[in-house]
Amino acid sequence: MNTPLTRKPLVLGLLLATGLGTGNAVAQLEEVIVTAQKRTESLQDIPIAIAAYNAENIESMGLFNAQDVGMASPSVQMPLYPTAGNNLALFIRGIGNADSVVITKDPTVGVYYDGVYAARSTGLLADLSDLERIEILRGPQGTLYGRNTTAGAINFINVKPTGELGFKQVLGAGNYGSWRSISHLNLDDIGGFKAKFTASFSERDGWVDNRGPNTIPGLDYTDYYLRETQGFRVALRYDGLENLVVDYSYDYSDMTSSPGYHQYGGPVGGLNPAFQPITDSFRDRLEETRSPIGGQPTAYYLPETDTEVDGHNLTVDWAISDSLTLKSITGYREFDDDASQNFTESFGNAGSLEVWTVTEHEQFTQELQLLGNQDRFQWVAGLYYFEEEGTQTEQQYLDRATVDLTGIIALDLTTFPPTPCSDGSTSDPFCSDFTMFFPLYLGEYAVDVDNESWAAFGQATWNATERLDLTAGLRYTDDEREAVRTHDGLLWNSFGPGVSASDLDETDYTLIADYRWTDDISTYAKVSTGFRSGGSSRNGLDFNQAFDKETVISYELGWKTELLDQRLRLNGAIYYMEVDDIILDYLPDPVNNPQFVEVFNSGEAEINGVELDVTWAMTENLLVGFNYAYLDYDIKDAIFPDGSDRSDTTGLVWAPEHAWAASVDWSIPMGFGEWLLHADYSWQDDQLALANTNFGEVLVEDFGLLNARASISGIEMLGGDWQLALWMKNVTDEEDVSYAIGATSFTFLMPRTYGAELIFEF
């Protein structure tokens, strides 16, 4: 939009904010600056449903990692991946990828670090340590962002060097042995060269103790939910030549963790595969590992999960003239992930499933942008190239066999009972004659992927009148993929070898009409498309059977308003999406064979919803926020691999019908500083964690979380500015289920956590 607005030139998060300054006679919302359309613009001026958080928001809300951001955004779900402690699944508007760790299946939410696309979400749980802003774009972004953004995109924009000597230190400690340290150092400008260095460290003990009398010396029994991270970032900038800015950055993260603890919550009675009675069902959150056979404390073998991620980014920005800019973004990222999970005995009759997954991945991206601003036209044209290579190896074990495992191995305990123990019985699964069979090695398989993609795109906005803007965009993509699966050659290994390859092209477009009724009220109508690449079922029985691309078209009506003299911001959107050849996961037997996942295309999904974002500066010192998301869907022509039509029973996972978040920020000026009190509450409706199985749906019931933070800042002493803060998460200590697999395996919300932070800056 061309119409100028009088706003404060500061960046502030849309949904929740830290509070208002005390120097204004009249409260007024601060302007939100974003780069969602590849150029710097006010959030109120762009026809995109978007949430933005700046560095102050991240600090005042106590957002330690990306999952915290997801809880504050009702349209976004970020469940922790069940077998990898450093990986999140990403969903926006009901579209996502539950198997986010699998390298043969692409995401639906694009993740970008300073403009560089990250093909995999491994390492997304690294500490948020040096961010200027987070932008969450909702809805298909196929034109400007490309493939695999059918649900939306998340931009992580890091702070650039200032060229002025400065230092900031964050020190924190809390319960469960947690502590964190973040250090920032800016150096003086030397001949146009600027530099900034950041180091972050954090640690938290596991909150589920993995202990028991059955431990064996020399084996690892890591507590569940352990986290330890360290990261470094170097940012360099050169702007010594007129009209030229060169930014280079290197980031490194090393994360050690353990996954979530899956409790047995199924029925009691009956016998497990070792002919022991299942006597206990744990429907309440445990903080120590226990066996459903007798309920006694039991240790489960569990090594730590180790993840290393690093990346290089080179951005060159050349202002050719006042109206023309050439921009180059070059990125290289890689990660190594060694993940372990022991599902304990949470599957009941399947014994204790143990999974080890090792992933090595590297990618290269190059993007060229030409941006223009002539008279009544603003436009961008570009070329994009992407390639990735990766290897993923997985081993699976059972601590004992089960009568339902005959499809995996030729061993049936009802036909071939265990060898009698020395006393003639077969009741003791740990006697010497019986343990020769266990732990039962189900096999190892490896998948190698080699993917390449290139695209050409352009988008232009025409200021047709002083009030009306018309936008059109187009993107052409060519996508080539190849994946090869090999295995260890054992006869009972069901993950047989295979090759999957595809070569496709797709054209996406965007059409927008944006009308400003007044300087503070605008509405827009938008049509946009996107596609998600096809792939292969890493954990499927037939690896040669690939699945095709998934396409989406979205129709959206939105509004951006600032009322009451810019004290009330009321934004929203109504959308309808059609997803064709929808990619679905099919688990034939999640209770006994949870490792089998068939991925396939079937039918279409119709998704519609409403989103509302409200920010109100009630007084000069009191700010409230409210955000709401409604979602409904219908799936048609869902023909499953077994030939059955399951349109009436097929569901989308992590797609709650209702979700909302509310916040309050109250600033209290004092003679020696300023108090800031923050509280936020987020709630999500019932949602499916697992669907499309032969055993029915797996539901995670609704839950809400209350968080709070109190700080006093602006304390000047010892030559710097000091801040002291106290924080608490899950204030009411809710014990709801957070993830479920099958009808018996559940994880729970983290207990109440609390801590203190000391921040020093000069």
List each language-model region with its residue ranges:
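Outer-membrane beta-barrel proteins
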Residues: 171-180, 203-241, 245, 258, ...
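Outer-membrane beta-barrel translocator/receptor signature
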Residues: 106-108, 120, 128-138, 143-219, ...
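Membrane-embedded beta-barrel scaffold of Gram-negative outer-membrane proteins
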Residues: 313-319, 323-341, 516-532, 548-610, ...
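Conserved C-terminal beta-signal and adjacent last beta-strands/turns
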Residues: 10-13, 359-371, 375-382, 652-762
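Outer-membrane beta-barrel domain signature, strongest for Gram-negative TonB-dependent receptors
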Residues: 221, 227-380, 387-389, 569-570
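Acidic, small-polar-rich N-terminal luminal/periplasmic segments of exported/outer-membrane proteins
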Residues: 19, 28-164, 557
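Gram-negative outer-membrane beta-barrel transporters
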Residues: 378, 466-470, 576-578, 600-691
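Structural signature of Gram-negative outer-membrane beta-barrels, strongest in the C-terminal barrel
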Residues: 237-241, 370-371, 382-386, 447-579, ...
